[in-house]
């Protein structure tokens, strides 16, 4: 770790020129190994990589790379000219994990120098997934339409390599990355949403994908900013559109590669852009015709600049008042909240009907039950079933597992507008736990509950520490029996999507 810190203190002008030699350092692979262990602890999963890692294998890998005279081997001749011998998969996993650590160094250096600035405020809470929903509550109620964009996957590996050329200036590292991708990955099925990648390191894969997505985001954000700062132009050229829009103020010409279009971008301070997983949301107060303009701009940008085949069907225009957006485990929509105000003036009284827009966040109960069914907690109809694979554990371990899953889901879906769906999920997990314990003790559910009583499962509905704080602040909105808070709560400590929520 000390050598890694020493490298970070190198001269800024030469930092990016020394990435490739780090592949011959053992501590790089130790860092990658430690990161894999930390990730497995966070997700409570055994990745199996720790059993294969050893310093002896790392030394053998470094010796093989040091003795190799050339790295450029044709992808078609990869079987005849094997670079690592019979341990191709293991060595390629180690190289990709080490490269994932190395390629992030320029970004880490930039982050360190950025955080040392005096004007930078601490924003650790913005790392939470829930931090986006208060923003949506403030902004989406004033918007009309949303573009639901499915980001296309690159059809060629070279696109991913080219996306890094602007950030990583080390040609040797880029050649090694290109060689690894062509040598060990199938070009036709490398990036598919339903196909797991066993050879390429997951950390490296997400880094490449985010770098690729950032390329088109930077172009889009540039156009978005220019649309609000360009000088006013004469509306005489757009006489045929005055009837529909009134005076049009802004026009920008974009020239990128062979893609040349005149895009009439109109000043719109109410446009918001969000990217999550493999999707993008573009919400605006524009008219449907303007949203169509953005739709076909995305398609043309992907096809002519990024050479990715995309269809207009991947970009859908929806009205927020009539459409529920499947977003980070919530179904979000804008609904009208009616209210009646009675006004008394002397002897006359007036009743005023008022309707305000409000962001409604609900739990996608059907998809969540599908995730529970896939995990063998219930059937496809939502009826609880036993978990036979856990029946060999102790009673306390079984109860602890179910309670932990239940509380994690409650913690993640605490921002739901309607708690009824959340209670149903708790019911499924509660009785799945009972059936698992009854199966272990070879008894029926009724006999098991009669013998031990139902009080031992009250942990599923007991008040958590956070809910206790809210009960002290808002005592009137809590139930006297169960003390469950009905309002929406957004937590600032959620850094990843729950595995059951991310059913895709």
From Swiss-Prot:
The record's annotation in Pfam families points to:
Intron_maturas2, MatK_N
What are its GO cellular component terms? chloroplast
SS bond list: none
Q: Which UniProt keywords apply?
A: Chloroplast, mRNA processing, Plastid, RNA-binding, tRNA processing
GO terms for biological process?
A: mRNA processing; RNA splicing; tRNA processing
UniProt KW Nucleotidyltransferase keyword: no
* Subcellular location per the Swiss-Prot or TrEMBL entry: Plastid, Chloroplast
Stored InterPro entries: Domain_X, Maturase_MatK, Maturase_MatK_N
Q: Where is the signal peptide?
A: none
MF-aspect GO terms: RNA binding
Which top-rank group of organisms is this from?
A: Eukaryota
Function per UniProt: Usually encoded in the trnK tRNA gene intron. Probably assists in splicing its own and other chloroplast group II introns.
Q: Which family does it belong to?
A: Belongs to the intron maturase 2 family. MatK subfamily.
Q: What is this protein called?
A: Maturase K
Supply the gene name: matK
